[in-house]
């Protein structure tokens, strides 16, 4: 029987995975279960650092805010940094293990010292990074809204959840078969899964497609 894999990303966002599945005769259902919309915002205070937890936070932030020469930019990991570079944004702090935000947050706190940080974010942000800093150093700014999409997904042998929000959207009208393998994109998604009473079979530390493909090879 042909293996069927679900990932909560659109095919256009995971070309290397699509190619791997074609090569290995794997049926891939690539479907993001969330969508985004801009939220109007104003920034009343000065800041020294802007931290981006995803490319979306950067995209929506720079729709309203100009890049500033006196501001330092930082982000959660290499994938986000690569996409920010396409917007002309170079980051001085880039997390090494995007799948382990708690670890990166501790490193980020040491790097920030006493500077003020703005955190462009979604309305559903977990605020992992801003919560570890003193309140007087933090500007939490909602710049976009995350909307969950209810969509029925065919039963699969392998499920790959790329964010807590995608997991929540999936579970609104779907169930994970008891014998399916579950791969999650980092600790935050793993923790959300645990709250639902489900244990992940694999947790991606770096949360990138090279790591994911190696895991899929080990399963098959």
What residues fall within each predicted segment?
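Signature of uroporphyrinogen-III synthase
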Residues: 1-220
């Amino acid at each position: 029987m042909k293996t069927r894999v679900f990932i909560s990303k659109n095919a256009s966002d995971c070309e290397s995975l699509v190619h791997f599945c074609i090569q290995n005769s794997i049926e891939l259902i690539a479907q993001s279960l969330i969508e985004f919309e801009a939220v109007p915002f104003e920034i009343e205070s000065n800041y020294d650092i802007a931290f981006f937890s995803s490319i979306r936070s950067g995209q929506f932030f720079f729709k309203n805010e100009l890049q500033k020469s006196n501001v330092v930019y930082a982000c959660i990991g290499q994938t986000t940094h690569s996409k920010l570079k396409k917007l002309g944004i170079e980051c001085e702090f880039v997390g090494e293990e995007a799948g382990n935000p708690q670890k990166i947050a501790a490193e980020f706190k040491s790097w920030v010292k006493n500077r003020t940080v703005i955190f462009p974010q979604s309305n559903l942000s977990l605020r992992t990074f801003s919560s570890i800093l003193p309140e007087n150093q933090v500007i939490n700014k909602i710049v976009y809204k995350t909307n969950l999409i209810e969509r029925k997904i065919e039963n699969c042998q392998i499920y790959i959840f790329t964010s807590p929000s995608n997991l929540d959207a999936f579970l609104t009208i779907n169930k994970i078969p008891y014998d399916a393998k579950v791969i999650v994109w980092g600790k935050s998604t793993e923790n959300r899964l645990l709250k639902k009473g489900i244990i992940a079979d694999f947790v991606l530390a770096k949360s990138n497609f090279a790591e994911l493909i190696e895991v899929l090879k080990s399963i098959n």
